[in-house]
Curated annotation (Swiss-Prot):
One Pfam entry name: NPP1
Functional summary from the UniProt entry: Probable secreted effector that may act as a pathogen-associated molecular pattern (PAMP) recognized by the plant immune system.
Compartment list: Secreted
Name this protein carries in UniProt: NLP effector protein 8
Motif annotated as Conserved undecapeptide motif, chain positions: 108-118
C-alpha cells in the first residue's frame, strides 16, 4: 500500500496545504462564472476520478453552476427573494469539483457541486443563496484495478452510506445521485435509479492557486466549500465507511 501511495503521488499530486498568502476575494454574478475545462486523464488520479464520476439527477431546485473561475472570482449566488429567476443551468457551462486522498488505505474521492440558491417551500419561501453538496467515493485496488466499495452521500443529517453500491444505482462505473428534498427540508443528495447528467470535472490540484485560495476562505455564511483542507479532511473522517 505504501508503494501505491508513492506511485499516485508521483503521477498526480492529490493533497495541498492551506498555507498560501491571503488576499481579497472578488465576486461575479452567478451566471457569469466561467468553469474550468474538464480535466484530462493525464495522471492516474484523474483517470480514476473520471472513470468513477457520479451522475447527478436534478429533481427540484437549481442545477449545479461553476463556483469559481481561474482568476479566483466566486459566484454571488442567487437570493431566495428572486423566486421566479431561473437557475436551471449556467450559460457558461456546469462544473463538478473533485479532490482525492489516500485515507486509511483506501482512495477517497470527493465530488462537490455548487448551487447558487437553496430553498424549501413551507407557508413562505425559506432558504439562502449559495449551497454546496458533496459525496465521497471510497475505492480499493488503487492502481491496477480500482473497485468502488462505498459511496457516502451528504444527507440532511450526516452521511448516507451505500456499501456496497447496489447495481440499480449504477451505470457502468458511475453511481447515480439525486439532488432532492422533502417538503419541509433543504436539498440533499441521495441514491437514485434515474439517470443523471455529468458536469465538467475539475480536480483540486488542476485548479489555479487563486481559485483554490478563494474556495479556502469563507466569504459568506453559506459559501463554504467542502474542498478546503479543514472541511475536506473532516468529511473523510465522518464519511469513512469501514
Amino acid at each position: 500500500m505504501h508503494l501505491t501511495v508513492f506511485y499516485l503521488v508521483a503521477l498526480c499530486t492529490f493533497a495541498s496545504a492551506d498555507d498560501q498568502p491571503r488576499y481579497i476575494i472578488n465576486k461575479l454574478p452567478y451566471e457569469q462564472i466561467k468553469p474550468f475545462p474538464a480535466v484530462e486523464p493525464d495522471c492516474r488520479i484523474n483517470e480514476i476520478a473520471l472513470q468513477f464520476q457520479p451522475q447527478l439527477h436534478i429533481s427540484s431546485g437549481c442545477h449545479p453552476y461553476p463556483a469559481v473561475d481561474k482568476n479566483g472570482y466566486i459566484s454571488t449566488g442567487l437570493g431566495v427573494s428572486h423566486v421566479f429567476t431561473d437557475c436551471d443551468g449556467s450559460p457558461e457551462g456546469s462544473q463538478v469539483y473533485g479532490r482525492a486522498y489516500v485515507y486509511k488505505g483506501y482512495l477517497a474521492i470527493m465530488y462537490a457541486w455548487y448551487f447558487p440558491r437553496d430553498y424549501m417551500v413551507s407557508p413562505v419561501w425559506i432558504g439562502h443563496r449559495n449551497a454546496w453538496e458533496h459525496a465521497v467515493l471510497w475505492l480499493g485496488g488503487l492502481t491496477e484495478d480500482p473497485e468502488l466499495l462505498a459511496v457516502a452521500a451528504k444527507s440532511m443529517w450526516g452521511y448516507r452510506t451505500y456499501a456496497p453500491p447496489k447495481s440499480k444505482y449504477m451505470k457502468d462505473d458511475s453511481f447515480k445521485l439525486e439532488y432532492s428534498w422533502m417538503v419541509m427540508s433543504h436539498h440533499y443528495l441521495t441514491a437514485t435509479k434515474d439517470p443523471g447528467e455529468f458536469q465538467d470535472l475539475i480536480m483540486w490540484n488542476n485548479m489555479t492557486e487563486r481559485a483554490r485560495e478563494s474556495l479556502r476562505l469563507k466569504s459568506s455564511s453559506h459559501f463554504k466549500s467542502p474542498l478546503s483542507d479543514d472541511r475536506f479532511f473532516r468529511a473523510l473522517r465522518k464519511s469513512y465507511p469501514f
